Amino acid sequence: MAFGPAAMGYDRAITIFSPDGSLYQVDYAFEAVKKGWTAIGIKSKSSVVIASEKRKAQSLLDVDSIEKVFLIDDHVGCSFAGLASDGRVLIDYARNIALQHRLIYDEPVSIDYLTKSVADVKQMYTQHGGVRPFGVALVIAGIDKSVPKLFMTEPSGQYMPYQAVAIGQGYYTATEFLEKNYKEDLNVEETILLALKALSATLKPNEKLTPNTVEIGYASTQTGLFLKMTNEDKNMYLQKL
């Protein structure tokens, strides 16, 4: 995205709209999301699944230190695409919201309220001088009173519920795959396989998913708990692709 001298003032100031109604710094934040590792969220009638690829930014990096699916509370988890530091800050904020809600009300926070709270923070950073937008999109999923919930929050502060959603580098290819193959009546195993197939569709021809290059989190209405999958379980599902 390039702009001439006439657009420079709108380009640099986050609080000023351009003549065509754009906030360029927010647009740039969306570009940061598109450069992130692909993450996918899928909701069925009985489960939710988040799958995200993870790669080494440096060859000597310990792959076990890379985390792309995060627990927010017992019943909800998330992943992100974009700037990792921005994602970490928002995930910590979401965890604090969930913890405070349990301490005050002695019950799990609703996923709708949790998502709105995170989105409100992101929106605030689009309208004040001296700050920049969060360059990250979050996929938030879990079980809320026996009902599967799936949301995606954008850098602008917009958030929407989804049946299935993809963010990051491979979002376009993954979204096309999900539009063709998504079914609402999938069980948890079928939902996990669909997420892995959608993620595989975004890879180059000579690449394939391994237990070390993908993270999976899931929850079912049967237990209501959001769990992260072990390497042994990931390998079992990857062999079925």
UniProtKB/Swiss-Prot annotation:
Any single Gene Ontology cellular-component annotation: proteasome core complex, alpha-subunit complex
InterPro entries in alphabetical order = Ntn_hydrolases_N, Proteasome_alpha, Proteasome_alpha-type, Proteasome_asu_arc, Proteasome_asu_N, Proteasome_sua/b
Q: Mind listing the GO molecular function terms for this protein?
A: threonine-type endopeptidase activity
Main localization of the protein? cytoplasm
The protein's UniProt keywords, in alphabetical order, are: Cytoplasm, Proteasome
The known regulators of its activity are described as: The formation of the proteasomal ATPase PAN-20S proteasome complex, via the docking of the C-termini of PAN into the intersubunit pockets in the alpha-rings, triggers opening of the gate for substrate entry. Interconversion between the open-gate and close-gate conformations leads to a dynamic regulation of the 20S proteasome proteolysis activity.
Q: Where in the cell is it found?
A: Cytoplasm
Source domain of life: Archaea
A GO biological-process term: proteasome-mediated ubiquitin-dependent protein catabolic process
Q: How does it assemble?
A: The 20S proteasome core is composed of 14 alpha and 14 beta subunits that assemble into four stacked heptameric rings, resulting in a barrel-shaped structure. The two inner rings, each composed of seven catalytic beta subunits, are sandwiched by two outer rings, each composed of seven alpha subunits. The catalytic chamber with the active sites is on the inside of the barrel. Has a gated structure, the ends of the cylinder being occluded by the N-termini of the alpha-subunits. Is capped at one or both ends by the proteasome regulatory ATPase, PAN.
Provide the function of this protein. Component of the proteasome core, a large protease complex with broad specificity involved in protein degradation.
Q: Which PANTHER family match?
A: PROTEASOME SUBUNIT ALPHA/BETA
Q: Which HAMAP family is this protein grouped with?
A: Proteasome_A_A
Q: Which family does it belong to?
A: Belongs to the peptidase T1A family.
What's the name of the protein?
Proteasome subunit alpha
